[in-house]
Amino acid sequence: MTTKCTLNRSILAVAAVLGLSGSALAAEQKPEVQRLFQSGSYEQAVEAARDGDPASTFIAAQALLKLDRSDRAVAEMTRLRASDNAAWRLIAESGEALIADDAGRAADIARRAIEADGDNPFAHYQLGLAAGKANDWGTAVEGFTRAVELKPDFAYAHYYAALAYQRQRQLPKTAQHFDAFLRLAPDAPERGAVIAILRTIK
């Protein structure tokens, strides 16, 4: 029994006290990938995510979709499907279905990803994306707000939550999430449009 073993046990004990699951601990990602994505530096985000963790690969796919490079986004999702983690494989499969404009199938698979790991914020985010594409705004709100709860620093979960709430005419919630988006992603390409919307609803 070494100091290292004692330290490992201490880390696990702290995680248990804080209520952190294995999924939450494993959800660490390259912070620069999310930062670049949220600032609109999409190609740089893709480059930074290269050979990275599943979350960074997922964000790289989202960056490529912003660039209208669905072919490369599919390639990133295919790479993600090689993950050892069942939830990530399902998130990737859902992403592929959504890129193919099969929103219903994408939503069904995203729900399976949530069943596999309900603590993965990107599973809920993917459900929100799929539900939004299907105009199922209630489910979209649920997906994005749960993603925000699990990963409060993910600006685009706030952004899409705001859009979904706007569709439901829940304007205070819309403003709340748009404000969070602007705070987390001050350089995002959507900044001007978001400020304009906020002026009309506040």
Placement of each model-derived feature along the sequence:
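Bacterial N-terminal signal peptides
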Residues: A13-S21
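Structural signature of tandem alpha-helical TPR/SEL1-like repeats
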Residues: Q44, L67-E76, I99-R112, A134-R146, ...
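Residue-level recognition of tetratricopeptide repeat
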Residues: Q34, Q62, G95-E96, L129, ...
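Helix-start (N-cap) detector for alpha-helical repeat units in TPR-like alpha-solenoids
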Residues: P54-A55, A87-W88, P121-F122, W137, ...
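Bacterial N-terminal signal peptides that target proteins for export
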Residues: T2-L12
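Structural marker of alpha-solenoid helical repeat scaffolds
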Residues: D51-G52, A82-S83, A116, L150, ...
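Canonical tetratricopeptide repeat
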Residues: I59, A92-E93, Q126, Y160, ...
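N-terminal leader/linker segments that initiate helical-solenoid repeat arrays
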Residues: A24-I59, K66-D68
